[in-house]
């Protein structure tokens, strides 16, 4: 190989080395750029995903916007419907659901679509029906019952609160079963709206009363009714409790003695709070000898039973009326929540603020005959002692008295009235005392 060829060969080798160095450098730069690009893309992707899927992301905002649009549309439809009902009530005298309409009181100009109680008087409803009085106070009429009209005959329902004989919750609205004629009175709980734009609050609960005078010792219940606390044991006057679990009771007189308790205390409380009230029998119970069921009717002989049988009879009066396996309404013996809260209702709206301390008995008489009618409810302050589902822990020597009666009574042996509406008295599980029968009063609660 000559000199010229050697020179060319060396140049070629040098160029190859240089090319390899340049290629390596370019490859390193490209890889770095690629890594940087990927990192940037990942960062941007994270930002983008966060912008899309985060709590305040695009999708969430879009959903919120759609929900707000849907709610605005529904509000518009509701407003149009209310306006239509209001116009219809002014032009045709009724609401869109076929019942007399009108505004509620208290400054609320939004028309109510709830039927007025006044339009349903005398009509047996074919389902549980919510209705309201002129002041916007709601009741629930059970299926198969009707609201009684104001009357002037003995034993009639009377409505005087509004001054026009139209039923108002403050009067004690009377319902009657369309088949058997049994009567009950609505006892409201919660906030009640009055005709002068004031309100009163009646709290469902067990209250304490002075054992000597019968007077209410505190407007705050000793046990406020709630589903959460109904299982708690709260003792009044050292011996009186309302047990939450059902038991049938027995007639024992020793330490095994038990009273019969409420059918389903939690259900009574939950339905009462949800509906804003419950029904208490208008009269002390009598007994139909043909059907062997108790009744709540005017001018009937008061039934005498043991506490255990009183609970059984009250439960079986209507049982648990159900449709599609869902409760419509149920009957039970009055419990201490119902008895005490009824006293509060009557003292608030009857004009007799000392009702808890009264006994109006002048004789032992048939149901509704004594002058003892307040808020359309008869004889709670007198006539017969009345069994409740309340429990007594009292014992004397070896005798136990697990049952509790309430109210005043008239003694047939000496012709005098004893005790008063709020009185609690422990008793054994007997049918009759030496001075008169032990009566009962059922209640209804509506789903």
Task: Write out the residue ranges for each language-model feature.
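C-terminal, surface-exposed recognition/capping segments
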Residues: 337-340, 362-447
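N-terminal leader/signal peptides at the extreme start of proteins
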Residues: 1-27, 105
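Ser/Thr/Gly/Pro-rich low-complexity, disordered linker/stalk segments of secreted
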Residues: 92-114
């Amino acid at each position: 190989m000559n000199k010229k060829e050697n020179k060319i060969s060396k140049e070629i080798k040098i160029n190859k080395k240089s090319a390899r160095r340049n290629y390596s450098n370019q490859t390193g730069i490209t890889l770095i750029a690629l890594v940087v690009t990927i990192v940037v893309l990942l960062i941007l992707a994270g930002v983008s995903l966060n912008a899309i899927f985060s709590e305040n992301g695009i999708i969430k905002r879009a959903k919120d916007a759609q929900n707000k649009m849907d709610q605005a549309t529904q509000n518009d439809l509701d407003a149009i419907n209310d306006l239509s009902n209001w116009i219809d009530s002014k032009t045709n005298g009724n609401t869109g659901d076929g019942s007399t309409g009108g505004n509620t009181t208290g400054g609320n100009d939004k028309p109510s679509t709830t039927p007025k109680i006044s339009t349903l008087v005398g009509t047996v409803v074919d389902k549980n029906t919510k209705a309201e009085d002129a002041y916007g106070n709601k009741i629930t009429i059970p299926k198969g019952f009707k609201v009684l009209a104001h009357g002037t005959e003995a034993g009639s329902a009377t409505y005087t609160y509004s001054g026009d004989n139209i039923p108002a919750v403050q009067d004690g609205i009377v319902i009657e079963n369309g088949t058997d004629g049994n009567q009950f009175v609505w006892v409201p709980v919660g906030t009640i709206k009055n005709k002068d734009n004031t309100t009163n609050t009646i709290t469902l609960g067990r209250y304490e009363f002075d054992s000597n005078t019968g007077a209410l010792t505190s407007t705050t219940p000793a046990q406020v009714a709630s589903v959460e606390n109904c299982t708690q044991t709260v003792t009044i006057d050292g011996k009186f409790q309302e047990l939450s679990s059902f038991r049938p009771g027995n007639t024992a007189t020793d330490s095994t003695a038990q009273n019969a308790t409420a059918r389903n205390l939690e259900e009574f409380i939950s339905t009462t709070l949800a509906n804003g009230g419950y029904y208490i029998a208008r009269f002390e119970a009598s007994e139909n000898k043909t059907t062997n069921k108790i009744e709540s009717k005017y001018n009937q002989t008061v039934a005498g039973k043991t506490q255990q049988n009183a609970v059984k009879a009250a439960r079986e009066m209507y049982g648990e009326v159900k449709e599609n396996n869902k409760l419509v309404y149920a009957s039970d013996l009055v419990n201490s929540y119902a008895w005490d809260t009824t006293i509060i209702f009557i003292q608030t709206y009857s004009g007799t603020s000392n009702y808890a301390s009264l006994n109006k008995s002048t004789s032992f008489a048939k149901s509704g005959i004594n002058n003892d009618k307040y808020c359309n409810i008869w004889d709670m302050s007198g006539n017969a002692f009345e069994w409740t589902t309340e429990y007594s822990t009292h014992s004397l020597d070896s005798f136990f008295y697990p049952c509790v009666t309430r109210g005043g009574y008239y003694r047939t042996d000496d012709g005098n009235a004893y005790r008063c509406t709020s009185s609690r008295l422990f008793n054994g599980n007997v049918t009759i005392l030496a001075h008169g029968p032990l009566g009962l009063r059922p209640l209804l609660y509506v789903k």
